[in-house]
């Protein structure tokens, strides 16, 4: 094919690709169009699919056929022009047909966002400080008590409700004197103090005994009356308290593979240390990313940012039957407003796009590769997170066309981990943090890698002599 294309740089993040297609190259496309139309159009005296081109033109008009050909060829010619021009496009193009002369010339232009050129900072110049962590006896006791609670037993009590009790309750609600059926339930189990149900419920329950009721006001967060203040009535059916087993060697044998309480505590200490290291690793990753974002200028493609904003808004109004007025009411009930929501959404979208572009640029510069094992590991993790079978999750991701997004996410995370190893990290007590234990050794620079490979080759040659 001899498609001619030129690129105009409209901004650091947007280009116009001008494409010219010689008309003679459209002959195969016209042939396909005639063949398809012949199967659709009934012309007396001809079997379906056998009517000649001239009759089809007479029946439909040359213009209609030309329009179909143009619509059919645009995607392929656009993709060809993108490949030839070597531009890194993002998102969908805005295409305009600029010239079409039957039998002579066909030309169009495509405006599209592109990945901007990004000047990356010297990672060795970056420094971040994270919280130091210690492991105290209170951490071990907290874990031990949590384990004891898992093996605790519930016993009915005849006294007023206290925090930590387990109650069976009935709930009903009214808005402006009208009952709200979807907010009513009976025999609901609830741990007092967990804060897992309606705001204000735990406070209302404290001090009630079985058979007693109490009214309180709260804001409904879901359903037809979301965002509205409701009068809630709670009735206590029963009260139970949790009795914990003694923390001794017998409990250690019951709750673990250890024979003594001291062995169990030592294991809990190791677990707490691992958890705190994971938390510190997360803080390191977040702060290194923030430092990169602060040090790097990243031009933002407007349409990509807008697409991110539109996606967030679509998800937000989905829970309100796509009624933006209801969304505004819910926001006001939470002490916010639609203006604040739009501002926060825009800022979050800009940061998200900037982060993706920056990490993609780092991955490109560092030659970050993603293996099949790493991709599979992420898919298994995501499937578990959503409570889905891996096969079902993969099928859903493929149907949604999101497998590339999963790959990109893994690559970005790997690229960021590579940068962390080159950044100076200290904790709040002034100690240097060994990031290699958390993120692995930093990858060698390309020049160093080449030199190492050359040295290995020389050594192998010497060994073979």
Curated annotation (Swiss-Prot):
Pfam families in alphabetical order: FKBP_C (PF00254), Trigger_C (PF05698), Trigger_N (PF05697)
SUPFAM superfamilies: FKBP-like, Triger factor/SurA peptide-binding domain-like, Trigger factor ribosome-binding domain
Main location: cytoplasm
The PPIase FKBP-type domain, residue ranges: 164-245
Keywords assigned by UniProt, alphabetized: Cell cycle, Cell division, Chaperone, Cytoplasm, Isomerase, Rotamase
Compartments, as annotated in UniProt: Cytoplasm
One GO BP annotation of this record: cell division
Annotated Gene Ontology cellular component terms: cytoplasm
Compositional bias segments (type: Basic and acidic residues): 456-465
Keyword Repressor included in the entry's annotation: no
Task performed by this protein: Involved in protein export. Acts as a chaperone by maintaining the newly synthesized protein in an open conformation. Functions as a peptidyl-prolyl cis-trans isomerase.
Record text about domains: Consists of 3 domains; the N-terminus binds the ribosome, the middle domain has PPIase activity, while the C-terminus has intrinsic chaperone activity on its own.
Protein name: Trigger factor
Native species: Nocardia farcinica (strain IFM 10152)
Gene that encodes the chain: tig
């Amino acid at each position: 094919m001899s498609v001619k294309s030129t690129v105009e740089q409209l901004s650091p993040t947007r280009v116009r690709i001008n494409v010219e297609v010689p008309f003679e190259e459209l002959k195969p496309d016209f042939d396909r169009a005639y063949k398809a139309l012949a199967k659709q159009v009934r012309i007396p005296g001809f079997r379906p699919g056998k009517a000649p081109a001239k009759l089809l033109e007479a029946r439909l008009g040359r213009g209609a056929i030309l329009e179909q050909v143009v619509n059919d060829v645009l995607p392929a010619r656009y993709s060809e022009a993108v490949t030839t021009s070597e531009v890194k496009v993002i998102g969908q193009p805005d295409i305009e047909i600029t010239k079409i002369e039957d039998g002579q010339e066909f030309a169009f232009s495509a405006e599209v966002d592109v990945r901007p050129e990004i000047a990356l900072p010297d990672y060795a110049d970056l420094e971040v400080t994270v919280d130091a962590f210690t492991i105290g006896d209170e951490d071990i006791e907290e874990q031990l008590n949590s384990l004891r609670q898992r093996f605790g037993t519930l016993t009915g009590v005849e006294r007023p409700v206290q925090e930590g009790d387990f109650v069976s309750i009935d709930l009903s609600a009214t808005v402006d004197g009208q009952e709200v059926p979807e907010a009513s339930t009976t025999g609901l189990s609830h741990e007092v103090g967990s804060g897992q149900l309606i705001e204000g419920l735990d406070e209302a329950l404290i001090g009630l005994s079985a058979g007693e009721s109490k009214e309180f006001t709260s804001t409904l967060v879901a359903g037809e009356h979301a965002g509205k203040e409701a009068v809630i009535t709670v009735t206590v059916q029963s009260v139970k308290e949790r009795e914990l087993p003694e923390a001794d060697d017998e409990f250690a044998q019951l709750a673990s593979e250890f024979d003594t309480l001291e062995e169990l505590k030592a294991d809990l200490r190791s677990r707490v240390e691992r958890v705190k290291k994971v938390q510190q690793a997360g803080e390191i990753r977040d702060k290194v990313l923030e430092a990169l974002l602060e040090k790097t200028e990243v031009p933002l493609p407007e349409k990509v940012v807008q697409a991110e904003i539109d996606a967030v808004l679509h998800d937000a109004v989905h829970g309100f039957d796509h009624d933006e007025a209801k969304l505004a009411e819910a926001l006001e009930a939470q002490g916010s407003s639609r203006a604040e929501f739009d501002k926060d959404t825009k800022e979050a979208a800009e940061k998200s796009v900037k982060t993706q572009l920056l990490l993609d640029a780092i991955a490109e510069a560092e030659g970050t590769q993603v293996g099949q094992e790493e991709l599979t590991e992420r898919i298994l993790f995501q499937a578990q997170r959503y409570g889905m079978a891996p096969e079902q999750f993969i099928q859903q991701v493929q149907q949604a066309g999101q497998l590339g997004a999963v790959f990109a996410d893994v690559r970005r995370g790997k690229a960021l981990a590579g940068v962390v190893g080159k950044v100076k990290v200290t904790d709040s007590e002034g100690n240097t943090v060994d990031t290699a234990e958390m993120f692995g050794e930093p990858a060698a620079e390309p020049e160093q890698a080449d030199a190492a490979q050359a040295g290995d080759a020389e050594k192998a040659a010497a060994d073979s002599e």
